[in-house]
Amino acid sequence: MKQGICIQGPTEYYKELADYYSQFENVVWATWNDESIIRLDYIRNKGIEVILLEKPTIAGYMNVNMQLASSYAGVNRLFELGIDEALKVRSDTIVTNLDKLLPRLQGKKLAFMATCKVGVRKDIAYDLVYYHDSHDYPADNVVYGNIHDLRDMFNFQIEDMLPIPPEALIAWNYMTTQDMTFHLSYKNMINEGISFFLQECLEENVEVNWLKRGVNLVDWYKDKTVYEW
């Protein structure tokens, strides 16, 4: 069973990510064809394969189409390389202690770190199959899964500027392509075979450092009054 890592997004933190993730095997970085040549060469010289893409004509609400395009390109390349399961990470995120975490994730069909507890953070509302009156979707900075499930999840684009959180749209697409009942409650996702791995992060002293915000997402998501896992 071969595991891989897909980094997706722009190259702002190219040195930090390339220096760290280059110690692992089967790493690709899917980014845009207008990124700095100096940055791209640095990444390549670290042994990470770079996949260059044209930006989608329609970026989508909160750049959802850009996230989808880069994520799909990365996991699809890993599929072509014969990878069975992969970790998808944003290009502003470093997951520490991966040598300990990756073996713990092996065999998971699709896994997120955590999901927003329904009805707690009520500063948004949106319509997607049913009315949602709070943040209620899984976190997507880091996602692990079977390579076929990851390809299915990211293989779509949104033509309209729908004011729906990208995380919710991506979860909806995955669940509908797998003929799952779409509801973003923790109980339903668990019942449908989706899992969460914050507990493994805690047990292995993993940090998920979101460089853009300067926070360790493990500390953020472990608050069970706000998140479930």
Q: Which residues does each PLM region occupy?
A:
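GT-A fold catalytic core of metal-dependent nucleotide-sugar glycosyltransferases
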Residues: 75-112
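N-proximal low-complexity "stem/linker" segments adjacent to membrane-targeting elements
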Residues: 1-12
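A short acidic (Asp/Glu
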Residues: 16-18, 39-41, 96-102, 154
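Active-site-proximal specificity loops/subdomain of glycosyltransferases
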Residues: 32-80
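Short, polar loop motifs at secondary-structure junctions
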Residues: 10-13, 31-38, 116-119
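Short, well-formed alpha-helical segments that are part of the catalytic scaffolds
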Residues: 11-23
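Short loop->beta transition adjacent to catalytic acidic/histidine clusters or analogous donor-positioning motifs
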Residues: 2-3, 22-29, 48
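Catalytic core and acceptor-binding pocket of nucleotide-sugar-dependent glycosyltransferases
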Residues: 95-100, 110-125, 131-229
